[in-house]
C-alpha cells in the first residue's frame, strides 16, 4: 500500500508539515510512504527577491513529482500554502496537467487529502484545502480530512492551525513562525488516518 505526499513550499513551513505527515503515515504497518515536491514555476530572480532561495535550496533533495506517480499511489496527500484563499499556482499548474489521468480514470477510488498553511490565523487555510476538493472529486477520489478524534483541534489556549478539513499551520506575516508541536501532531495524525483508510480500501479489493 503506497502513500504519496506531494507538496509545494516556498519558505519551508509546508515542507515541515509534509515531513510530519510522512511520519504519521509510516506508523501504519505495510505503508510505503513517498515524499515529493511539485515543480517550481518562479524564476531564480523572483525567488531571490522574495528571500526564498535558501529555503528552496534546503528542500532540493526532495525529488520532483510526476503526474504518473499519482496513479501509482493508493492515497495522495497534497500540501500547499495559501494564495488569496486558494492553493498556490505551482500546485494548480501540477494538477492541471492531470487530464490524462482523468481520461483513464486512474485516480478513481484512491484516497485524497490536503494540508495547508497561511500567514495569519484566518488567512484562508480552510478555503485553500477546499479548493482542492473540486479537483479531487472530479478525479473520483475519496476525500479524507482530519477528524475531531484529534483532540488538538479543540485547543483554545494557543493560536493553532487545523480543522476537520485538514492539518494546517500559521506561518506569520513574515514567515517567522514555525509549525508548533500541536500543528505537527495534527499532521502526523492526518498522515496515519489517511494511510489507515487507504489500507482498509486496498484490503477490501
From Swiss-Prot:
Ranges for the Flavodoxin-like domain? 3-194
Q: Where does substrate bind?
A: 102
| Entry-linked PROSITE patterns | FLAVODOXIN_LIKE
Give the protein's cofactors: FMN
Q: Tell me the cofactor note.
A: Binds 1 FMN per monomer.
Q: Enzyme class, one word?
A: oxidoreductase
Query: Keyword set for this entry?
Result: Flavoprotein, FMN, NAD, NADP, Nucleotide-binding, Oxidoreductase
Which reactions does this protein catalyse? a quinone + NADH + H(+) = a quinol + NAD(+); a quinone + NADPH + H(+) = a quinol + NADP(+)
Identify the EC number(s).
1.6.5.2
Identify one Pfam family in the record: FMN_red
Protein residues bound to FMN: 9-14, 82-84, 138
| Binding positions for NAD(+) per the UniProt entry | 11
Instruction: Mention any one GO cellular component term assigned to this protein in its UniProt record.
Output: membrane
Query: Which family would the database say this protein is a member of?
Result: Belongs to the WrbA family.
Report what the protein is called.
NAD(P)H dehydrogenase (quinone)
UniProt source species: Geotalea daltonii (strain DSM 22248 / JCM 15807 / FRC-32) (Geobacter daltonii)
Q: What is the lineage of its organism?
A: Bacteria, Pseudomonadati, Thermodesulfobacteriota, Desulfuromonadia, Geobacterales
Amino acid at each position: 500500500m503506497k502513500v504519496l505526499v506531494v507538496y509545494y513550499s516556498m519558505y519551508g513551513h509546508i515542507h515541515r508539515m509534509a515531513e510530519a505527515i510522512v511520519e504519521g503515515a509510516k506508523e501504519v504497518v505495510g505503508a510505503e510512504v513517498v515524499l515529493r515536491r511539485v515543480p517550481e514555476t518562479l524564476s531564480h530572480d523572483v525567488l531571490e527577491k522574495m528571500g526564498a532561495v535558501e529555503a528552496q535550496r534546503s528542500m532540493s533533495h526532495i525529488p520532483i513529482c510526476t503526474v504518473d506517480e499519482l496513479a501509482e499511489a493508493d492515497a495522495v496527500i497534497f500540501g500547499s500554502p495559501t494564495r488569496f484563499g486558494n492553493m498556490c499556482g505551482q500546485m494548480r499548474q501540477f494538477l492541471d496537467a492531470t487530464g490524462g489521468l482523468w481520461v483513464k480514470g486512474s485516480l478513481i477510488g484512491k484516497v485524497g487529502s490536503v494540508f495547508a498553511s497561511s500567514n495569519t490565523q484566518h488567512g484562508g487555510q480552510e478555503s485553500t484545502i477546499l479548493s482542492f476538493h473540486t479537483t479531487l472529486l472530479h478525479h473520483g477520489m475519496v476525500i479524507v480530512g482530519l477528524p475531531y478524534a484529534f483532540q488538538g483541534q479543540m485547543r483554545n489556549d494557543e493560536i493553532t492551525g487545523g480543522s476537520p478539513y485538514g492539518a494546517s499551520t500559521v506561518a506569520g506575516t513574515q514567515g517567522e513562525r514555525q509549525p508548533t508541536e500541536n500543528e505537527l501532531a495534527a499532521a502526523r495524525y492526518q498522515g496515519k488516518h489517511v494511510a489507515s483508510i487507504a489500507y482498509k480500501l486496498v484490503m477490501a479489493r
